[in-house]
C-alpha cells in the first residue's frame, strides 16, 4: 500500500510530466552551458527569424586563437555563414555553415576545411547541430549554444570530445559590422 507521501511524489511527477512541454522534456544539460537533444522527435518549433540576430560580421577569440565569422541574413529558407580560425596571421581551418528550417525546427550544418581547403568530412557528410531550445537571449543547438550578451557581443559554447573526455570550449564574439 502506498503512503500519502508516495502518492504526493507520484502526483507531482505526473503533473510535471504533463505541465512541462514535450520539447523541454526532450533535452538535458550536457555541459555547464550546452544541451543535448534526448528525443529528436521533440524539437521546438522555430524559423530562421528566431536566429536572424546572428546576421553580420563577428570576430573574437577561441581555442587560444582569433576567429572571424560572417552570417548572411535569412533568405530562401537558409542562413549561410563562414568561419575562419587564425593563428599568428595564418589560417588554421575554415567552416562553411548553414542554418536551415527542417522538420518544423532548425538545424545548423557545418563542413570543415583545412587551410588548403581540403575537406575534413567526406563529400556528402557534414556535422549537424539540431535545435534543442531557446532560453531568453540564448539559442541552444545540440552541443552548441549561442548567448546574446547585447547587440554587439555574444558568447558561444561548443562541446568537444577527445579520447573519451568531454569538455566545453568558449568563444567570445564581438560584432564588427
Provide a role label for each language-model segment.
Residues 42-57:
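N-terminal helix-cap/turn-to-beta initiation motif at the start of protein domains
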Residues 140-158:
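Surface-exposed interaction patches
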Amino acid at each position: 500500500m502506498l503512503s500519502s507521501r508516495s502518492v504526493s511524489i507520484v502526483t507531482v511527477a505526473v503533473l510535471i510530466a504533463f505541465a512541462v512541454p514535450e520539447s523541454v522534456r526532450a533535452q538535458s544539460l550536457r555541459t555547464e552551458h550546452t544541451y543535448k537533444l534526448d528525443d529528436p522527435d521533440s524539437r521546438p518549433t522555430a524559423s530562421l527569424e528566431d536566429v536572424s540576430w546572428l546576421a553580420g560580421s563577428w570576430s573574437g577569440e577561441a581555442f587560444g586563437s582569433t576567429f572571424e565569422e560572417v552570417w548572411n541574413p535569412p533568405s530562401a529558407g537558409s542562413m549561410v555563414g563562414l568561419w575562419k580560425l587564425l593563428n599568428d596571421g595564418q589560417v588554421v581551418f575554415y567552416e562553411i555553415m548553414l542554418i536551415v528550417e527542417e522538420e518544423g525546427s532548425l538545424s545548423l550544418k557545418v563542413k570543415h576545411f583545412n587551410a588548403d581547403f581540403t575537406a575534413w568530412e567526406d563529400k556528402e557528410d557534414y556535422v549537424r547541430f539540431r535545435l534543442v531550445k531557446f532560453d531568453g537571449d540564448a539559442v541552444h543547438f545540440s552541443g552548441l549554444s549561442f548567448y546574446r550578451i547585447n547587440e554587439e557581443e555574444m558568447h558561444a559554447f561548443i562541446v568537444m570530445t577527445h579520447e573519451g573526455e568531454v569538455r566545453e570550449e568558449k568563444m567570445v564574439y564581438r560584432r564588427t559590422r
